[in-house]
């Protein structure tokens, strides 16, 4: 699934980076592929997005006017025409493979052509501060449910049901795991290192959250305290509530971290407290951009104005991300089990020209 021509150059580049560069914390590169088949025999829509950490850097949409891979980050725009040609061909091949897989999966599950169906894939790699592989993954889902996943050993598969076992047997016979493992341990890590170097001003920054607590009366006896964290990057953050110094785990409303639309993120955590006891509750915030964790209380005399415009913008971006990529929310969960892997044969799987950061095109289901 990868073009070998530039591999020697990339190996030299990644080796140099490994010797000269270290990165704070771990980093990840992930691709999300989604194929949606409409009812009947219409052509499936295929959408692909790529992320380094929490930053989208590439997108492809088979329904777009310009069906090419599109840069979504300044640091990837510097890649030349050959890079974008390879990216585009990768996505087009994957779209063709997923079209076949959707047809086969309908047969495996004995489904008619009346309904709409979705086939998803998420794959990628994580590296540590030393730039070495920490973890690789390749997970597939059908209609929002786990289908098959590469195990943590990168040598074997876990099938979610009897239909997925059909795919598992095909992939084991094709020795597909071995080739995917070679990609995850090799080119995936190499290109992630390259992106981290090229985009270090963006990808390795740490923007601390802007925080405050708001008070919302419910009745004469209760009120909601909401702890806000806005404008932070990267997305990983921890918000907790304590009562008299003891962490509260029950009845906490915690929203998922949301994109703000400007490259940063938003999050809040809320809980209902007895009126008059608000000062017994503290919100605790931990984030990479903070020198030390923050502790906040509601200050009755200085209720801040909630930045509704920014929050609405964040929700709008979230909606676009969800509907445009239809990807992460229902991706399969990882499983682990033992087993033997192998190397993918051309006869069983699409074997693309290899290059840049493109993964092996997934075998047909």
Curated annotation (Swiss-Prot):
Parts of the chain on the Cytoplasmic side: 333-365
**Quick one: a GO biological-process term for this protein?**
positive regulation of T cell mediated cytotoxicity
Q: Name the PROSITE patterns for this protein.
A: IG_LIKE, IG_MHC
Extracellular face residues: 25-308
Taken from the UniProt record, the cysteine pairs bridged by disulfide bonds within this chain are 125-188, 227-283
Q: Which InterPro entries match?
A: Ig-like_dom, Ig-like_dom_sf, Ig-like_fold, Ig/MHC_CS, Ig_C1-set, MHC_class-I_related, MHC_I-like_Ag-recog, MHC_I-like_Ag-recog_sf
Signal sequence, start to end? 1-24
Q: Where is this region: Alpha-3?
A: 207-298
Bilayer disposition of the protein: Single-pass type I membrane protein
Q: Which GO terms describe its molecular function?
A: peptide antigen binding; signaling receptor binding
Phosphoserine PTM positions: 356, 359
Describe the family membership recorded for this protein in Swiss-Prot or TrEMBL. Belongs to the MHC class I family.
Q: What does this protein do?
A: Involved in the presentation of foreign antigens to the immune system.
Q: How does it assemble?
A: Heterodimer of an alpha chain and a beta chain (beta-2-microglobulin).
Q: What is this protein called?
A: Class I histocompatibility antigen, Gogo-C*0101/C*0102 alpha chain
């Amino acid at each position: 699934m990868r073009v070998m021509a530039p591999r020697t150059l990339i190996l030299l580049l990644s080796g140099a980076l490994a010797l000269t560069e270290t990165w704070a914390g771990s980093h990840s590169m992930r691709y999300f592929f989604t194929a949606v088949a409409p009812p009947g025999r219409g052509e499936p829509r295929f959408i692909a997005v790529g992320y380094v950490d929490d930053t989208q850097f590439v997108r492809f949409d088979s329904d777009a006017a310009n069906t090419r891979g599109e840069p979504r980050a300044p640091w990837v725009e510097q890649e030349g025409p050959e890079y974008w040609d390879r990216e585009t061909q990768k996505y087009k091949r994957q779209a063709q493979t997923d079209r076949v897989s959707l047809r086969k999966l309908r047969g495996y599950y004995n489904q008619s052509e009346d309904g709409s169906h979705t086939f998803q894939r998420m794959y990628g790699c994580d590296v540590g501060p030393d730039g070495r592989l920490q973890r690789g993954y390749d997970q597939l889902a059908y209609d929002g449910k786990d289908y098959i996943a590469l195990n943590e050993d990168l040598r074997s598969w876990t099938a979610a049901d009897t239909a997925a076992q059909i795919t598992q047997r095909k992939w084991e016979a094709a020795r597909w795991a071995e080739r995917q493992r070679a990609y995850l341990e090799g080119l995936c890590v190499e290109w992630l290192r390259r992106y981290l170097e090229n985009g270090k001003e963006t990808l390795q920054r740490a923007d601390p959250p802007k925080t405050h607590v708001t008070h919302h009366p419910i009745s004469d006896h209760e009120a909601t305290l909401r702890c806000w964290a806005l404008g932070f990057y990267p997305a990983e953050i921890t918000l907790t509530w304590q009562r008299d110094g003891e962490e509260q785990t029950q009845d906490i409303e915690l929203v998922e971290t949301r994109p703000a639309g400007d490259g940063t993120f938003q999050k809040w955590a809320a809980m209902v407290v007895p009126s008059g006891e608000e000062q017994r509750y503290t919100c605790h915030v931990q984030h990479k951009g903070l020198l030390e964790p923050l502790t906040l209380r509601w200050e009755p005399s200085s209720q801040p104005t909630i930045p509704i415009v920014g929050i609405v913008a964040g929700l709008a971006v979230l909606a676009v991300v969800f509907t445009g990529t239809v990807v992460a929310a229902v991706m399969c969960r990882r499983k682990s089990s033992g087993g033997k892997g192998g190397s993918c044969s051309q006869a069983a799987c699409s074997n693309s020209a290899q290059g840049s950061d493109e993964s092996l095109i997934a075998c047909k289901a």
